[in-house]
């Protein structure tokens, strides 16, 4: 085993999505190998995070949450960058940046050159879930122009990493198509699922018994309430299938839900409207309301008789219970970068119906005539009619072949997607990083110079007081032993009066011509 390292993971918002699940699993896996691990994040709500965070199994430090996530519902990427820069600035100020041997950064790469510059010897591994610029909406010319510098920044700053890894071969192919000026060959580190079964909380057993009758069979969808997840596909396929009209079946739709996120609220309403237009009996339960005072919670009248049940932000314990007993997981996103939920289902022997593109091509073994010993589900085109047929095919197949998926699923997941397998992949890539010399990429210098210029120009809003911002910046750089940059800022402090006169003279000269 390698010498224990002090490892920092930097992640923007430690919620309950797939990216956050990977961060938590990576942290636990590395910690179990004897490394000291700290997760730095700009936001972590203890009521909206994974159980390992709630229990305090991992050290989590929140920095920069005082900054807004958006400005009037816009400028999300700008605010995300500012929050991450505030986080790194705090690490520089308090000296924590020099305590870490390795930084694992994901989602947002803006801080990578800064980590290289201000850390005495730390290496940086960037985990690319998917190019951020492909996730951004560009509905107008203004939004397209607004994204241009951030797209370039993503590419340049990611290129400053010591190593880049991606979550699937699908993402790897997209990486090559997107980042054309980078000469990187990222390796694949698959996300994982914990093979150990989570203990099911008593309150969740009680919750389950309240919504599922003893003779009910249910189909399950688990995703965030976002339009790109195409949860409507599961809903429309279920109501078009024969199974959907059976008296003992229902559809459970669970989703990560945050009332602060407008799309979560809007999309849940859209799904409810689909049910109402089709005269499908449905009910919505916000799990957080139940979990606050479970002994006093009153379930909606006739909840067991509802055909569709929407559950918002359920606990990991309830999720485990639902996955274990589901008839079939309906995994609806198209071109999903990886998709962890199918693995969580297959771990319990629950078959999966997923779209035949993106990550599921690597995680779900579709049933064919010659692979009954390895099949874990079905891959089908994202069409409600085709999915309805697959749902009915599954029902017939499981009746004739009970136990097939209960054997195949867990074995497939354990062999390729366990936490041990993922940790081993991470350690292999970390070994490779430390086998080579630490190199500051030219991109890093360019980014730092650009940032210095922006800071210099921005500080002018403070008038003559900006001189002392220069002096403060220079002092911080001296403390961090970055003497050349410190000299630059001290010179600005000394020469500020002359620079101001020069700028005023040039402005006065050009003004009549303009």
Curated annotation (Swiss-Prot):
Pathway: Protein modification; protein glycosylation. The keyword Thylakoid does not apply. Mannosylates Man(2)GlcNAc(2)-dolichol diphosphate and Man(1)GlcNAc(2)-dolichol diphosphate to form Man(3)GlcNAc(2)-dolichol diphosphate. It is an enzyme of class 2 (transferase). Belongs to the glycosyltransferase group 1 family. This is Alpha-1,3/1,6-mannosyltransferase ALG2. InterPro entries: ALG2, Glyco_trans_1, Glyco_trans_4-like_N. It comes from Eremothecium gossypii (strain ATCC 10895 / CBS 109.51 / FGSC 9923 / NRRL Y-1056). One of its GO terms (cellular component) is endoplasmic reticulum membrane. The gene is ALG2. It is a multi-pass membrane protein. The chain crosses the membrane at residues 443-463, 468-490. Its EC number is 2.4.1.132, 2.4.1.257. It catalyses: a beta-D-Man-(1->4)-beta-D-GlcNAc-(1->4)-alpha-D-GlcNAc-diphospho-di-trans,poly-cis-dolichol + GDP-alpha-D-mannose = an alpha-D-Man-(1->3)-beta-D-Man-(1->4)-beta-D-GlcNAc-(1->4)-alpha-D-GlcNAc-diphospho-di-trans,poly-cis-dolichol + GDP + H(+); an alpha-D-Man-(1->3)-beta-D-Man-(1->4)-beta-D-GlcNAc-(1->4)-alpha-D-GlcNAc-diphospho-di-trans,poly-cis-dolichol + GDP-alpha-D-mannose = an alpha-D-Man-(1->3)-[alpha-D-Man-(1->6)]-beta-D-Man-(1->4)-beta-D-GlcNAc-(1->4)-alpha-D-GlcNAc-diphospho-di-trans,poly-cis-dolichol + GDP + H(+). GO terms for molecular function: alpha-1,3-mannosyltransferase activity; GDP-Man:Man1GlcNAc2-PP-Dol alpha-1,3-mannosyltransferase activity; GDP-Man:Man2GlcNAc2-PP-dolichol alpha-1,6-mannosyltransferase activity. Its main location: endoplasmic reticulum. CDD domains: GT4_ALG2-like. GO terms for biological process: dolichol-linked oligosaccharide biosynthetic process. Glycans are attached at residue 94. The keyword Aminoacyl-tRNA synthetase does not apply. Signal peptide: none annotated. It is found in: Endoplasmic reticulum membrane. Keywords: Endoplasmic reticulum, Glycoprotein, Glycosyltransferase, Membrane, Transferase, Transmembrane, Transmembrane helix.
């Amino acid at each position: 085993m390698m010498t224990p390292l002090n490892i920092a993971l930097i992640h923007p918002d430690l919620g309950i999505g797939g990216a956050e699940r990977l961060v938590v699993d990576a942290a636990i896996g590395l910690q179990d190998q004897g490394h000291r691990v700290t997760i730095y994040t700009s936001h972590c709500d203890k009521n909206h995070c994974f159980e390992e965070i709630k229990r305090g199994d991992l050290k989590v430090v929140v920095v920069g949450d005082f900054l807004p996530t958006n400005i009037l519902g816009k400028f999300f990427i700008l605010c995300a960058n500012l929050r991450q820069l505030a986080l790194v600035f705090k690490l520089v100020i308090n000296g924590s940046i020099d305590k870490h041997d390795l930084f694992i950064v994901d989602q947002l790469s803006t801080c990578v050159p800064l980590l290289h510059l201000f850390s005495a010897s730390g290496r940086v591994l960037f985990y690319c879930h998917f190019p951020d610029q492909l996730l951004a909406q560009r509905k107008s010319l203004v939004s397209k122009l607004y994204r241009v510098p951030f797209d370039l920044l993503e590419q340049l700053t990611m290129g400053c990493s010591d190593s880049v890894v991606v979550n699937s071969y699908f993402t790897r192919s997209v990486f090559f198509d997107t980042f054309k000026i980078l000469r990187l060959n990222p390796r694949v580190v698959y996300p994982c699922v914990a093979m150990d079964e989570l203990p099911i909380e008593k309150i969740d057993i009680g919750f389950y018994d309240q919504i599922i009758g003893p003779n009910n069979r249910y189909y399950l969808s688990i995703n965030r309430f976002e339009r790109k997840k195409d949860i409507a596909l599961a809903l429309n396929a279920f109501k078009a299938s024969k199974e959907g009209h059976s008296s003992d079946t229902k559809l459970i739709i669970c989703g990560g839900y945050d009332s602060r996120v407008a799309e979560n609220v809007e999309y849940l309403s859209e799904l409810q409207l689909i049910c109402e237009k089709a005269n499908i009996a449905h009910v919505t339960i916000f799990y957080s309301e139940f979990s606050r005072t479970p002994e006093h919670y009153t379930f909606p009248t006739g909840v067991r008789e509802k055909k569709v049940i929407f559950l918002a932000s359920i606990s990991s314990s309830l999720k485990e219970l639902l996955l274990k007993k589901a008839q079939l997981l309906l995994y609806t996103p198209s071109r999903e970068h990886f998709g962890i939920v199918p693995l969580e289902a297959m771990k319990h022997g629950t078959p999966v119906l997923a779209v035949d593109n993106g990550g599921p091509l690597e995680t779900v073994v579709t049933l064919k005539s010659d692979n009954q010993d390895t099949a874990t589900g079905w891959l089908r085109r994202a069409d409600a009619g085709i999915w309805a047929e697959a749902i009915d095919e599954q029902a017939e197949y499981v009746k004739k072949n009970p136990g097939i998926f209960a054997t195949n699923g867990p074995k497939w997941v354990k062999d390729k997607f366990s936490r041990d397998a993922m940790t081993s992949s991470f350690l292999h890539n970390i070994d490779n990083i430390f086998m080579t010399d630490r190199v500051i990429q030219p991109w890093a210098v360019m980014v730092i110079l650009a940032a210095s210029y922006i800071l210099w120009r921005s500080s002018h809003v403070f008038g003559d007081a900006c001189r002392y911002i220069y002096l403060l910046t220079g002092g911080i750089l001296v403390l961090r032993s970055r003497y050349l940059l410190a000299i630059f800022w001290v010179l600005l402090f000394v020469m500020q009066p002359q620079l101001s006169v020069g700028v005023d003279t040039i402005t006065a000269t050009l003004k009549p011509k303009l």
